């Protein structure tokens, strides 16, 4: 991002409209190409001259695209002719895929610069740890154990594409870019296909950015109003939702509040709430009563529905009591567990026992969901009985073994934070036996005869890398007593959900 900022040194008069000219500069396409190579799950092929023959960046394709954007009349092609109309040997859809990738990279630049400036002066031990999915679990273990209720919300998509354009309009003041963006979005994006999927017509990263920017907008409003929640019943705040002038009205509201409203207007105690958003969901955790939790549910849902045109389904907004209900969170089932502790205390000649109760966040593996995912991918049946993977029998033995080992290690790595690893061993057993059945089927043999011929050493590859490393870190007595299997370990290098972990 620091290297990209060097290309964007414009004077103050041009900073409001610097996006649109970037579409006609070749070095921006090089930046988008290089940015895509350094990230996972990117559509790299759109910058390649011939995907099947030679994977290299083609400046010729970029020049053709820029030339075509200059010729505005040729740019407007009916949607039904996306795949039929060719321009210099490429379909129209191909060029609009390039534009979607480029637009995502360009629009991310001002947002990333603004985000980076917000972290200035703040100290983080290791900034890259914040990118890990597992980094959120230690935070929840420390915070959720003190709370009673959690509001679990599935965040819906906007009901119309124009809402996303309006969201960007509040941040990006470049009218030319927004008109160009609106044209591409309406002409070449079918609403039925508007979802963040790998098989989306346009770049998934493009829609991820639009979705996150829209969610951040109503989150910023909610956080501001939540801080002033004790005074909202006596203060008219509807005028704040004129979105263009909202951030200016915040300052005006604060001045009026300080000068005109005494502190005694706070009829309700301002509750302490933690808000976490993850993977299309969000949770609000608090120690309030059920009545106040329903208040916040009504408050949050109506804010989003009335002012941001997103419709929440009632069955996807739930209030869970952590001591009784399980919270589905990033592939784990989390709940509060009471651990009774007996402490023996002795003062002089008198001794007595003290009963303490420790509240602990319990993270479990959703075994039913994982078995359902394994059954869907033909690793086992719906009851969890391993079956052979017939579609892999054409591969070599080493390739088959490596595939199963990789899946087993990925699942073990992700669920290393489980408080009870018994279900994890069951999953590893299913994959291990499925691997043996697949190899036996390939060699037209039975499982018993195949293992007798090759020996049990074949399955030693399933020993996870974590087991090998942890056996060297922890004392031998500690490792031999198998207490290590009850230890929860959170890794800070997990940046995405494995397909078998994501069950939705």
Swiss-Prot record:
Keywords: Chloroplast, mRNA processing, Plastid, RNA-binding, tRNA processing
InterPro entries, alphabetized: Domain_X, Maturase_MatK, Maturase_MatK_N
Highest taxon, organism lineage: Eukaryota
GO cellular component: chloroplast
One BP term from GO: tRNA processing
Subcellular location as annotated: Plastid, Chloroplast
Pfam families: Intron_maturas2, MatK_N
Family statement drawn from the similarity comment of this UniProt entry: Belongs to the intron maturase 2 family. MatK subfamily.
Known function: Usually encoded in the trnK tRNA gene intron. Probably assists in splicing its own and other chloroplast group II introns.
Protein name per its UniProtKB record: Maturase K
Organism: Rorippa palustris (Bog yellow-cress)
